[in-house]
Amino acid sequence: MMKKFILALISMSLLLASGCAHIEEYDTEETADTEETTEVQTVTVDNPEYYTRFKNDGISINVYNWGEYIPDGSEEGVLNLNAEFTKLTGITVNYSTYATNEELYAKLKGGGSTYDIIIPSDYMISRMIKENMLEPLDKSNIPNFANIMDKFKSSEYDPSSKYSVPYTWGTVGIIYDTTVVDEEDIGWDILWDEDYSGRILMFDNPRDAFAIAENMLGYSLNTENSEELEKAAEKLKEQKKVVQAYVMDEIFDKMGAGEAIIAPYYAGDAVTLMDEYEDLGFVIPDSGTNLFIDAVCIPVSYTHLTLPTKA
């Protein structure tokens, strides 16, 4: 029974990704005697009956997700999506975040965790499947799976989407300070450029860091050749002398404050940064980049949860 509750959350998570849920914005007056207004967001769904069926069952579930993926209402006018989910379904979401796939993996592998929903990346999903860490999904309980684009339903890491439902995809490029760095000079090799020593940030996760080094060396970004991996590792060691820090979400503060001027990161996050800081730009080098998919999964440890009680 618990799995059905969890699958309901997966389906809700897919609403925004598939377009079945709508975030509406409207203006409300701050006071009766002023013309100042503020934008307020709310969520509506096409089939509310499906999502309200557990409303009075006193259910709570634990979600472990990337740090910047779901709005928490901390910005003015931006909704708290988990709170909206609870309002709609009656299901309480206990929400925590991680910065890397490796952090997620270590937490689950160490045991003692009771997460119901996780959102790892493609390569980590493949590893978790091989290590029997993920629960097979019953697609009949995930109606919004039908709204996922077909090209994302079949992949090397989970060929039939037996264990995962694609949530988002993106690419990696380079965020840079346009007042210091010329776009025409940007390739992956700029991350090794001694002219910018101490002002370069680098990924604090092996998958994306190795992909950049492999690209520079002309290797497949998915190589499993031990010699090529060793050479990529040496390339990354060479870079260390020019790197200010190895980061993930810390990039927002460091690039925003001007502490660093060059950093590889994800396209979606780059858009967020550029919206806030007009001097930042984003480039995908001509030599190419990697495409990633993050997907919703249920870890086998979900069965350790106590079954829900009536409210």
Regions found by a protein language model. Give the residues of each.
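Conserved small/polar residues in nucleotide/adenosyl-binding loops
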Residues: 303-309
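Early extracytoplasmic/lumenal segment of secretory-pathway proteins
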Residues: 40-127
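A ligand-binding cleft/hinge motif common to bilobed small-molecule-binding domains
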Residues: 125-127, 262-279
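Bacterial N-terminal signal peptides
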Residues: 9-17
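Periplasmic-binding protein-like
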Residues: 147, 229-238, 276-300
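Extracytoplasmic ligand-binding site segments that recognize negatively charged/polar headgroups
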Residues: 62-78, 99, 113-259
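Bacterial lipoprotein signal-peptidase II cleavage site
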Residues: 21-28
